[in-house]
Each structure stands twice: as C-alpha cells, then as structure tokens.
Amino acid sequence: MFDKLEDLLIRYEELMSELSEPDVANNPERFRKLMKEQSDILPIVEAYKEYKQCKQNIEDSLAMLEEESDEEMRELAKEELNDAKNRVAELENELKILLLPKDPNDDKNVIVEIRAGAGGDEAALFAAEIYRMYQHYAETKNWKTEIMECDDTGIGGMKSVTFMITGAGAYSVMKYESGVHRVQRVPATETQGRVHTSAASVAVLPEAEEFDVVINEGEIKWDTFRSGGAGGQNVNKVESGVRLRYIWKNPNTGVAEEILIECTETRDQPKNKERALARLRTFIYDKEHQKYVDDIASKRKTMVSTGDRSAKIRTYNYPQGRITDHRINYTIYNLAAFMDGDIQECIDKLTVAENTERLKESEL
C-alpha cells in the first residue's frame, strides 16, 4: 500500500510541474485531462502527507520522552504521542478506502425513474413525494433537476416520473436509492383510520455519454405527435412530442428487443429529440452493464449499492415517524425532515457500509 502511496505522491508533484508549463496551459484538452487526474489523487495525497506528519510526530514525542526529565513536558509528550497514534490509525483506514478502485460511473449525472407500485392513488402520491424528496436534496447539493417524462394523476400524484439530476458526483450518491421504497400510513381517503401499505420503485441510472455506447442513429425510427398538457395553442398545433423506436441486441443475452421512448416535456421538438436520445443511450448502457451489476450482487451479502431494483430497501412508517433502511438495519425518527430532502445522514451510513464491505473484498 505504501509503495503505491509514494508513487502517487511523485505523480502529484509531476502533475503540478506539468500544469505550470506554458504549452499545457495553451492546450485546453490536455490541461483538463491533467487537472482531472490531479483532482482525483489530491485527497489521497493530502491524507498521506498528514499520515507522514503524524508518524514524524510519534518519533518526536518518543524522543522527547527519552530525553526529557521535566514531568510536565513528559506529560505533554505522552498526550501528543497518544493523539498522533490515534490519528495514524484513522488515516490508515481512510487511505485504504481512498485507494479502493473508483466506480467509473461515480462522476456521472443520473437519470432517475420513479414508478408507483400497487396501491392506486396512494402509491402515486407517495411516488410524487419521493420525487420531491430528491428534488429538495438536489437543491442542497447545488444540483440541477429536470423532468424528462411524467405521468401525473391530476390530484398531486405521479404514476411515474423520469428526471435528470446534473451535478458533480451525482451517481456516487444517488446510486444508493435504487430499489423498492415502502410506505405505511393512513391514506387521506381512508375513513376507518386503517394503516395501508403501498410502494414505489426507484431506478437510478448513470447518464451515458455518446462514447459510452454504440448506436446506429440511422436505424432509429422517429415519430412526432402533438403533446398534451397545459399551455395555449402551441399544444394543439405543433407536433413537439417525439417517439423513437430502436431495435437493439443485448450482448449479454443475444436477444433483440425494440426500445420505445417518448419525450413530451418541452415544446421544442429538437430538445425533446435530444432528451429521448440521452435516455436511449442511458437505457442501453444500463442494460449492457447488467452483467457487471449481477456479478457484484452475487459477491456481496448486504447489497448496499448493487443496483438491484427489486430489493426492498427502505420503509417509511408515518404513524411512528420512522424511516428504516433494511440494507444496513438503520432507523431514524425524523420522517418529516427526511421527506423534505434531509437524507444525507442515511447516505453517509450507506457509504460507510459499502466501503467497509469493499475493504473486506480487497487485499489492502
């Protein structure tokens, strides 16, 4: 591990030197590439530098204890020695986690699909609340959210909604939300006061870039149509809605299937086409990486972020004001704040659980 850390320290110094060269500054593509590499290894370098300083502090404190006869100074040295030893242990664990292979999708934007499960209007209302929860959470992270497709009930619920979250590291955080979310509460329409259970499923997909998948755009069949919704004469006269059909062969199964995607969210047909293509790329990328996801799921016992969308991951119990995440057996009692987007504490616990799991799998 320490040989690798020394190599990274040397590489960081090389990058700093290269970035200061005029020819690099005049080459935007190379400059961006080097800046990305530098920012990726900076947290490791900073932690390792602190680790080395703490090791030096331990040596200095031990030397002081051998040489110093003044009792007050010896006590100070003992205190500094203890602090340095504790920090070294913490940093060793941090460095092991920082050296774990990074998920190649972690830096990507995400496309989130929320679908109401069984439960009629109540399930659709819960799906809409889950959407708003993520919307509010995204605001706290300074991320941008944009609806791509929505099937609303007209009474505040959503049968389904697909939206994009754009922001640094969105997938690294949102990937923990894939799965079935279950709600237990008394619906507004319930006259007997009985608690009902309904659910919504969430799929979080890393947005695929154009170079991530191969699509023969000449084989896409496009249809246009008048999109429904509020907003004046444009809705009736302009065919801004788009529908694409694309035959795709799954490389993992060898089976060909037709992909159908509609986009009606804007009154700008080119923009709707662009969004439909983005969803097509993401769908194919997700399917092509399913084997990788399945392999991870088969190896891991806790399934913190395997992407298994059929797994029941969380229960929202309104009568008790309780949220329980079943993957890590974690319960909190701040449901109102949680539904308003205060989910970071839960995300942090899931991140720690996954890193612990990955450390067990690694040889570090």
Predicted regions and their residues:
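Charged, heptad-repeat coiled-coil alpha-helices that serve as long linker/dimerization "arms"
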Residues: 1-110, 356-364
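Ribosome-associated translation termination/rescue signal centered on the conserved GGQ peptidyl-tRNA hydrolysis loop
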Residues: 90-364
